[in-house]
């Protein structure tokens, strides 16, 4: 929940290295994390941290689409939101911020003004690169057919997407007749844009098992003793010791710390929570709890992030085949998407690094080769992928997939450009053929594989 400090614009020399003359940029896919937010639950009120934060000015400016009675006319309804909670006598009271604020008060896990600012700035940075510097996208848009935008059903993800779009194409860059953009969402049970333990029983089993293993490894260590020395006195009576599986969990403690770091002095914890060694320990354990499964288990990769990566690669191959599977059918436009952006959470971005080792109803399009495994393709089908490359960048840093390092699996002279064929081959291994069916399979099987199944190959 703390802000990435972005680098400045790329120089011309950097652009030449990132985008070699012998290659032509064809498709950009951006996976963004939602912006800064308030904590998802109220913690450490005994340490002076107020449960309700005054950083959500959008609460004064809410807008809803309303339909007039006996008419098909729609009118935007502007309204102001205030939050209500329990008072000391269990009666209703208006939630207040640290200084008694009743407006601008955030709900739990809500995108804050800071989060809106940074995601809008992300859109501006993307415009600078893909519009101004590379000329890949148009300066002025008359429609949004070339865009594929998707967000999870969590409001902060959708709002972050909207802010990023606004930063990339502010009002002056949209023609007066430009229709509103289409943003794709799914129901929670169908969502694969984040690791969906709520919609996938088997993945819930796996994630709990890896979390428990982390607890067994770390709860009785010197590192955990140090955390208890620092902040144990603020733990609740019902769970006095800091632990991976305490209440609040260690990951929940990290959530609150990071949220406070991203915002103002009115919502800060005591200085012990920001001890550098303590923060490093919390982050190390949190990464193990949440992401080690991707490194060790192909089933974990498949159910946790495989559906999303299958979609990502399908759109890459669809862009090569020009068969509509690059997002054209979903958006209902006439032109194939050139730029795709999805808004989710930290668990998606970090999960993607880990797996590499590091609307309007339309008729379904042709299956093509996008969802076929590489091993099932004919020579003619496989040849369609020749000459296309995939590169991953994470927070402006180029990432090289281990399985793409061998000769013939990358662009000569640059291992970061993986051949589309090899990238698809790696992703095929953990792309579920039937995600919902697989989520109900192996429920009696062990959570851990017999031997570790390394990621990135």
How would you name each of these model-derived features?
Residues 1-148, 152-340, 346-457:
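Signature for phosphate-centric chemistry
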């Amino acid at each position: 929940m703390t802000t990435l400090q972005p680098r400045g614009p790329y120089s011309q020399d950097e652009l030449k290295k990132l985008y070699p003359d012998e290659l032509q940029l064809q498709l950009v896919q951006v996976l963004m994390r939602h912006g800064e937010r308030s904590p998802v639950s109220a913690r450490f009120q005994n340490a002076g941290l107020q449960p309700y934060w005054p950083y959500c000015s959008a609460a004064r400016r809410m807008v809803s689409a309303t339909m007039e009675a006996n008419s098909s006319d729609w009118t935007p309804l502007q309204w102001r939101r205030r939050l209500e909670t329990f008072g000391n006598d269990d009666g209703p009271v208006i939630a207040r911020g640290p200084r008694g604020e009743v407006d601008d008060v955030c709900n739990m896990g809500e995108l804050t003004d800071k989060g809106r600012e940074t995601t809008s700035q992300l859109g501006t940075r993307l415009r600078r690169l893909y519009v101004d510097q590379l000329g890949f996208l148009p300066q002025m848009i008359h429609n949004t057919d070339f865009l594929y935008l998707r967000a999870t059903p969590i409001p902060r993800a959708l709002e972050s997407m909207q802010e990023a779009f606004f930063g990339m194409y502010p009002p002056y860059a949209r023609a007066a007749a430009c229709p509103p953009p289409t943003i794709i969402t799914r129901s929670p049970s169908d969502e694969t844009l984040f690791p969906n333990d709520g919609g996938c029983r088997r993945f819930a089993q796996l994630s709990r098992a890896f979390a428990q293993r982390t607890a067994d490894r770390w709860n009785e260590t010197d590192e955990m003793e140090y955390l208890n020395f620092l902040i144990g006195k603020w733990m609740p009576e019902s769970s006095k010791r800091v632990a991976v599986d305490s209440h609040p969990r260690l990951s929940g403690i990290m959530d609150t710390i990071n949220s406070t770091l991203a915002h103002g002095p009115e919502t800060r914890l005591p200085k012990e929570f920001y001890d550098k060694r303590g923060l490093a320990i919390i982050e190390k354990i949190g990464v193990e709890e949440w992401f080690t499964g991707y490194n060790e288990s192909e089933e974990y990769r498949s159910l946790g992030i495989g559906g999303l990566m299958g979609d990502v690669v399908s759109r890459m191959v669809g862009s090569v085949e020009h068969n509509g599977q690059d997002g054209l059918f979903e958006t209902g436009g006439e032109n194939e998407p050139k730029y795709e952006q999805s808004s989710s959470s930290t668990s998606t971005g970090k999960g993607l690094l880990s797996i590499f080792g590091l609307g309007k109803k339309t008729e379904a399009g042709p299956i093509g080769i996008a969802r076929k495994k590489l091993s099932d393709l004919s020579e003619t089908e496989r040849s369609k992928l020749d000459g296309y490359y995939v590169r991953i960048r994470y927070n402006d840093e180029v990432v090289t997939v281990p399985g793409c390092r061998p000769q013939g699996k990358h662009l000569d002279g640059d291992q970061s450009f993986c051949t589309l064929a090899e990238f698809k081959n790696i992703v095929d291994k953990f792309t579920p053929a039937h995600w919902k069916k697989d989520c109900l399979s192996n429920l009696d099987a062990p959570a851990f594989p017999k031997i570790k199944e390394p990621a990135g190959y």
